[in-house]
Amino acid sequence: MKIERLLGATLCGLARIITGARAIHHAANGPDTTGGTTIYYANPRSHIDFLLVWAALPPSVRRRTRPVAGADYWLTSPLRRYVALRIFRAVLVERSGGAQAATDPLAAMQAALDAGESLILFPEGTRNVGDDLLPFKSGIFRLAQAHPGLRCVPVWVENLGRVMPKGSFIPVPLLCALHFGDALCLGDDEARDSFLKRSRDALIALAPTAA
C-alpha cells in the first residue's frame, strides 16, 4: 500500500501542476477536516475530474475517500485497472443501466458508505460536454436516504473540460478551480425530486457565472 500511496500523492502533485488547480471553499465554516462520511458531488467534464477533487482534499480525508467511476473506461487495460483499483481505490460501476446491468450500481457505493468511507460522485451519471448541468440521477438521493445524516458537499469544477477536451489524451495547461460549497443533508420526509433539485441548485450556485 505504501507504493500506491506514494503514486497517488505523485499523481495529485502532477495534476495540480498541469492544471494549476486550486480549491476555493465557499462553506461558512471553511474546509471540512473531520473526515466524517461525506459524498462530494461534482460536475463531470473529463475522466480525470475525480482526481482533482480527490487531490483537493486534506490527506487525512483523502485516505478515506473513494471516487465513483465508470467500469467501461477504467477496466479497459491493466494500467487503468491498476490506477483505479489500487491507487484510487475507486468504486467502479457499470453505466449501462436498465435491466441489462449485471449488478446494482449502488450496491458498492452503499458498502463503502457502510464502512465509513466517503465518495466522490457525479450525479449526472455521464460526462457532460455541454455548458448546462444535466438533470441528476436518483442515486445520490437513494444513498442519502439509506444513510441518515449523510453530508453531501457540492464541488463545482471550473475549466476542466478545456483542460482535457473530449478525445484528448494529453492535458492542455489551463488554470482550473474547484469551488466547494456548504454540505447538504436529506431533510426529514424530503421527497426525491425536492432533494435532487436542491442538490443541483447548490452545485449550480457555485459556478462563477452564477455569481
Model-assigned labels for residue ranges:
Residues 2, 6, 101, 195:
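Soluble or luminal CAZymes and related metallo-dependent hydrolases
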Residues 3-46:
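Helix-to-loop junction immediately C-terminal to a conserved catalytic motif
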Residues 34-97:
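Catalytic core of membrane glycerolipid acyltransferases/transacylases, capturing the structured
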Residues 37-39, 116-122, 151-153:
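Residue-level preference for the first positions of well-ordered beta-strands
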Residues 70-74, 125, 157-161:
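Short beta-alpha junction loops
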Residues 82, 118, 129-191:
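A cross-family acyltransferase "interaction/gating" segment
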Residues 90-132:
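Internal catalytic-core helix/loop-beta-alpha segment
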Residues 106-107, 111, 176-210:
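A charged, well-structured terminal subsegment
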